[in-house]
Amino acid sequence: MKLNNTAFLTTIFPMEEQFLIDFLDSLSKQTYKNFDVIVVNDSYKDFDKIKEQYCELNVVELPCLKTPAKNREFGINFCKDEKYEFLIFGDSDDYFSDNRIELSLSALNNNDIVVNDVSLFDDSGIYETMYMSNRLQDDTKISFEYIQNKNIFGLSNTAIKLDILEEVVFDEDLVAVDWYLYKGLLKNRSNAIFINKAITYYRQYKDNTVGLQVTDGKYYLWWEQKNGEMNEVN
C-alpha cells in the first residue's frame, strides 16, 4: 500500500541473503524516512522472513515478469500508476550512503534527473572510492551529448521526477535498460545533474560483472564507447 510520495524501486532475485540484508539495512538507516520500497520479486524465496525484520520500512512486493528488462518496465510503470512524485533506483545487491535519498530529493528540486557517485567494492572491501569523481565534479550538468558513447546512469545510482516519464516499454531482451532509458530522457530535454556527496556502494562479484572491465583482477565500470549491440535511441 502506498504511504509516501517517494518510491525506492528494486528487483530481487536469487542471491546471498547477506546482500539483501546489507541493502535493506542501508535503507533503514536513511536520514530521510518518508519513502516506500517497491520490490519486484524475481524468484527470491522466503522474502517474507526478511521483510518482517524491517517493519520500519513500507515494503510493497510485486510479482515478476519474464525478463530483467520487463521487470524494470513493470516496476517503473507501477510507480507511475500509483502516482508517486519521485522515483529512486537501487539494486538489491548494493547498499547506499545514509544521505542518498535526502540528497537525491534535494537535487530533484531543480533538476529532472539526479545521478550520484559510486564506490566499488568486493569481498575484500572497497577498492575504488567515488569512482565517477575521477572525471566529474559535484553539481555537473549532464547533457545528451555526454552519454552518446558512454554511460554513467545506472539503475542503482539515479533518481527522477516521475512527471518527466511516460509509460515505458522495453524490449524483453534489452540489456542496457539504464542507458536506453536515460538517453531517451535527455534527448527529450530532461535535465540531469551529477552529485558526489551521495554514494552507491556497487558490489562486484561473479554474477554482477556485465559491462565491466577487469584490471589487476578488479572490476571497473565501463567508460569507453558503447558497442553496436546496444539498443539505440534515434
Regions found by a protein language model. Give the residues of each.
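Acidic donor-binding segment of Leloir-type glycosyltransferases
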Residues: 28-61
